[in-house]
A protein has these predicted regions:
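Short beta-strand/loop motif that positions the catalytic acidic residue
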Residues: 57, 63-65, 69
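Conserved alpha/beta-hydrolase "acid-adjacent" motif
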Residues: 70-76
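Flexible "cap/lid" loop of the alpha/beta hydrolase fold
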Residues: 1-11
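Short, conserved loop/helix-junction motifs that constitute active-site signature segments
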Residues: 54-58, 83-86
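Active-site nucleophile elbow and catalytic-triad environment of alpha/beta-hydrolase enzymes
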Residues: 36-53
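Catalytic active-site module of serine/aspartate enzymes centered on a nucleophile-bearing elbow/loop
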Residues: 90-127
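Short glycine/proline- and acidic residue-enriched helix-loop micro-motifs
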Residues: 21-34
């Protein structure tokens, strides 16, 4: 990412091989296999802004992260949870599902975990 602005004229797109396995639900696998290199400059700026403003987040937060995610760093959930000021926060760790985990074989499990987390957060707020 740091050299994206210099690379953009010579390498217009950052691309990767589409994942070919049973991790994603085929009916919903409309993922992308690349993005414009110049967008990486914006992405880097947005990540920096987001990290600097995590302290403003006070609502319940459940981070969902997979060991199979090749897009984000393994410490991303920890960075987020350490930065937010939420009273109610947690992490749902998945194994071997890709970045777009909501359309993976874990989709139903994620939906159930989110429902449980936010119901418990609401009950906690009422108490």
């Amino acid at each position: 990412f740091p050299l994206a602005r210099f690379a953009a004229p010579f390498l217009p797109e950052i691309s990767w091989q589409a994942r070919k396995d049973d991790a994603l639900t085929p009916d919903y696998d409309l993922g992308y296999t690349g993005f414009p290199t110049k967008s990486a400059v914006d992405l880097r700026r947005i990540i920096h802004e987001a990290r600097n403003n995590l302290c403003a987040v006070t609502c319940p937060v459940l981070c969902v992260q997979s060991s199979g995610d090749q897009v984000i760093t393994p410490d991303s959930a920890d960075v987020i949870l350490q930065g937010v000021q939420s009273k109610t926060k947690g992490v749902l760790r998945l194994k071997n599902v890709p970045h777009v985990c909501t359309i993976s074989r874990e989709g139903a499990h994620i939906a159930q975990a989110l429902g449980t987390f936010f119901r418990e957060a609401e009950e906690s707020e009422r108490a």
